[in-house]
């Protein structure tokens, strides 16, 4: 329901009714921001925050993955911090290791650890300053820290801010919560160092983005399919015109389904779960065991313990137009 209210080019009647509450939200958020900035923690290690000003999935984690891979290729020593949304660790800060479950650290940290093959420290804490201090103490040779999300976590000083924008949803009706999808007013974009727009946006939206500096466009590119059970990798063309059921428990499943369709897969059914869904075997009851199941990397991490031989995830990369 909220999607129908928020993601319109212009606010509808209900959004207008909710606008007074949005003004209260903005006032509270501004006071919180000022209070946090007065006691900001400044690390000696440069910190880059990759976040957004809207709710929902915009593609932050793939951007973090891409940037960390670039730093590794330059022989740098990056580390990653995250809130660890939905995590149930015994203590914080919590370092992700090879034995860590997604339920302990959260979906995105688990996926990043797997994708980066344990090459970088990943530390989670609801208070990101704790995670930074843990890295400073335990990984003193770290020369850059990437924060997956946390743009509005002003307790932590940052050296660079990158905002990720979904080209399809953009900023919706451009109103703040609850009248619209924004966590902060759209004017906040004038303060950030870089904006990365993922997907193809309209000419009208490109005109809007001309008001902001350092806008980069990127698109999601399907790279390969990976078997969840065996980790076998195959070219995406292997699934051309093959029937498959698509599973998605992410913030914006439409993007995933579109990527599958662009890979010439014949999707016979789509099963959508809420973002950060804790998958169990019962979620797949009624699915023909002979048909191929395809899901996102983030979802696959949580299905490893009960995956079948014909379950795959689609790995992706970002094609950046610099």
From Swiss-Prot:
Reactions the enzyme catalyzes: a lipid A disaccharide + ATP = a lipid IVA + ADP + H(+)
GO biological process: lipid A biosynthetic process; lipopolysaccharide core region biosynthetic process
Gene Ontology cellular component list: plasma membrane
Pathway annotation: Glycolipid biosynthesis; lipid IV(A) biosynthesis; lipid IV(A) from (3R)-3-hydroxytetradecanoyl-[acyl-carrier-protein] and UDP-N-acetyl-alpha-D-glucosamine: step 6/6
One Gene Ontology MF term: tetraacyldisaccharide 4'-kinase activity
Pfam families with a match to the protein in the record: LpxK (PF02606)
Annotated keywords: ATP-binding, Kinase, Lipid A biosynthesis, Lipid biosynthesis, Lipid metabolism, Nucleotide-binding, Transferase
Function: Transfers the gamma-phosphate of ATP to the 4'-position of a tetraacyldisaccharide 1-phosphate intermediate (termed DS-1-P) to form tetraacyldisaccharide 1,4'-bis-phosphate (lipid IVA).
HAMAP family with a match to the protein in the record: LpxK
Record protein name field: Tetraacyldisaccharide 4'-kinase
Enzyme Commission number, as recorded: 2.7.1.130
UniProt binding sites for ATP: 54-61
Disulfide bonds: none
Organism annotation: Francisella tularensis subsp. holarctica (strain LVS)
């Amino acid at each position: 329901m909220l999607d129908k209210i928020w993601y319109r080019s212009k606010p509808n009647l209900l959004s207008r009714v909710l606008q007074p509450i949005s003004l209260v939200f903005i006032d509270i958020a501004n006071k919180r921001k000022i209070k946090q900035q007065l006691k900001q923690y400044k690390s000696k290690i440069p910190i880059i925050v990759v976040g957004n000003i809207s709710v929902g999935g915009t593609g932050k984690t793939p951007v973090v993955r891409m940037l960390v891979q670039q730093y590794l290729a330059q022989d740098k020593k990056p580390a990653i911090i995250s809130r660890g949304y939905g995590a149930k660790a015994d203590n914080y800060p919590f370092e992700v290791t090879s034995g860590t479950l997604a339920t302990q650290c959260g979906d995105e940290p688990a996926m990043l650890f797997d994708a980066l093959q344990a090459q970088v420290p990943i530390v989670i804490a609801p208070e990101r300053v704790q995670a930074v201090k843990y890295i400073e103490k335990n990984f003193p040779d770290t020369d850059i820290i990437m924060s997956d999300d946390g743009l509005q976590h002003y307790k932590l000083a940052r050296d660079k801010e990158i905002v990720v924008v979904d080209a399809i949803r953009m900023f919706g009706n451009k109103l703040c919560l609850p009248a619209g999808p924004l966590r902060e007013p759209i004017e906040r974009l004038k303060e950030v160092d870089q904006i990365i727009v993922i997907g193809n946006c309209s000419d009208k939206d490109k005109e809007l983005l001309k008001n902001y500096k350092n806008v980069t466009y990127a698109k999601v590119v399907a790279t390969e399919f990976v078997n969840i059970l065996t980790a076998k990798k195959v070219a995406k063309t292997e699934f051309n015109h093959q029937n498959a059921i698509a599973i998605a428990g992410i913030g914006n499943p439409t993007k995933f389904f579109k990527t599958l369709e662009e890979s010439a897969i014949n999707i016979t059914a789509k099963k959508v779960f809420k973002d950060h869904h804790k998958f169990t075997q019962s979620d797949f009851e009624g699915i023909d065991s002979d048909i191929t199941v395809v899901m996102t990397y983030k979802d696959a991490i949580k299905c490893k313990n009960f995956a079948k031989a014909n379950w795959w995830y689609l790995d992706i990369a970002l094609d950046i137009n610099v």
